[in-house]
């Protein structure tokens, strides 16, 4: 019985302490509210003395209250600074300094020494002598072969068929167990200029190999975020047979310049603008976003775009000299995450 009495007395003391702590918190909150209502800010030294750390408060409710008051104080100081800056800009009028540009990962990018200068003589010489020179000199016209990995599933097959409607003069061929080393000589003999291979894993497309014929290079991409036409909301009607316009964005380095020229060589030279179709390869933070749109002219001054599909995202894994050779091929560039991904502000394309 004595033990039961001790337990009841100790529990009663604990409940009294909790009530006292709750009343103290309510009084502190009420005092804080009254101070803010009267327009008088509590002194910083009293609320947060030098060397004060909120994490040192052992009482959870008290710690939460102090943290809330600290956040409110920070918010008020930030708002007051914004109002002060706005008044100063209004007072200066046209003489006000320009607004600072917000910092992003893109505009804080680490400078790459291989950034391409269009007026550089060395760049012009490389463009005139590289593997894509015959295409850009209009000596050859693109002819594309699109194939898959062995035993493709329906989603991969539909992606290949839809890609063939995006890229003019492209043909879909099913592997039937043939190795790529046997397919490439047959492509060269039939005057194909490029070979596209869509790989899959667990019935989902997850890779793309693009090989320029007959002398390479060969690029291997990781493919993600694949959306077929039926999966795109508010999509337009199926694309027409007009040659689309091609847009390449943000391929600035020597490596990115080569990849951009590789994509450009898939499409014929003279787009048919009457079809109002455009294929976009947009590079952002080394991710290449592919979109296929149609322009919608609502008036003489207003224009919109309507996505046709498909859409997907590519990430470059390697660039190999020559045609596809997994054993003895010479690689120009290979993505090594542990060595290359040391900074979020460093990009390679």
Swiss-Prot record:
Primary location class: nucleus
Gene Ontology biological-process annotations: maturation of 5.8S rRNA; maturation of LSU-rRNA
Domain Brix: 142-325
Pfam families: Brix (PF04427)
InterPro entries according to UniProt: Brix, IMP4/RPF1
Stretch list, region Disordered: 1-105
Basic and acidic residues composition bias: residue spans: 87-97
Domain of life, per lineage: Eukaryota
GO function term, MF aspect, one: RNA binding
Compartments it resides in: Nucleus, Nucleolus
UniProt GO cellular component terms: nucleolus; preribosome, large subunit precursor
Segments for region (RNA-binding): 303-320
Cited function: May be required for ribosome biogenesis.
The protein, known as: Ribosome production factor 1
Gene that encodes it: RPF1
